C-alpha cells in the first residue's frame, strides 16, 4: 500500500524514470546502463519510501504507542515542560530514509494543541534538532493520560504533513501525517508512565508499546 501523502511525488518519479528509460534507448551501451539503472533506483526508492503497510495496534488499555517507525536514540527526564506544567519523560525516535515515514496517533483522545514552527534543518539524530529544526507540535489529552509530541524535519526531510488540529478526536494507532525523507519524532509524557522501550531499540508506528500507565 502506498500512502496518499506520496502520490504526487510518486507521479513525478514515474515521469522522470520514463524519461530516463527513453533516453537509455538512444545512448551508448554503458551510458544507457547507467541511465536505466538510475531510473530504476528513483522509482524503487520512491515506492519503498512512501509504502504504508497496515498495522495491528494492541487492544490493551492504558498504553502509549510509538508514533513512528525507527530507532530510540534518546530517553531522558526533564524537570519542566510547558504543556504539562511539570516534569516529563522524553523519548526520541530517529527515522532513517529506509523506515516507513507515516506517523500514527500514540493515544486516543482530543487534540488540544497544534503548532507549526519553521526552523533549521540540522541532522535529525542531532538532539539539538528537537528545539531548532522545522517541526510541528501536537498535544493530545486522553481519558487518563496526555501526551505531547513533535514531528521534526531533518537535513533531508523538508516537508512535514500533519492532518490533526485542535478539537479533533483521534484514535490510537491511526495515521495522521508523515515526514518526508529522514526525520525524527520526540514524544513527552508524565514521569509516572512505565517505559517499555530502551535506547537503541527499534520501534514500529502503531504497534510498539513505548509506555504503560
From Swiss-Prot:
Enzyme class: lyase
Gene Ontology BP, a term: phosphatidylethanolamine biosynthetic process
Free-text remark on how the cofactor is bound: Binds 1 pyruvoyl group covalently per subunit.
Entry's Gene Ontology molecular function annotations: phosphatidylserine decarboxylase activity
Keyword Lyase part of the UniProt annotation: yes
Catalytic activity from the UniProt record: a 1,2-diacyl-sn-glycero-3-phospho-L-serine + H(+) = a 1,2-diacyl-sn-glycero-3-phosphoethanolamine + CO2
Residues bearing the modification Pyruvic acid (Ser): 183
InterPro entries (UniProt xref): PS_Dcarbxylase (IPR003817), PSD-A (IPR033175)
Protein family (similarity comment): Belongs to the phosphatidylserine decarboxylase family. PSD-A subfamily.
Quaternary structure (record): Heterodimer of a large membrane-associated beta subunit and a small pyruvoyl-containing alpha subunit.
Name of the molecule in the record: Phosphatidylserine decarboxylase proenzyme
Organism: Chloroherpeton thalassium (strain ATCC 35110 / GB-78)
Lineage, uppermost ranks: Bacteria, Pseudomonadati, Chlorobiota, Chlorobiia, Chlorobiales
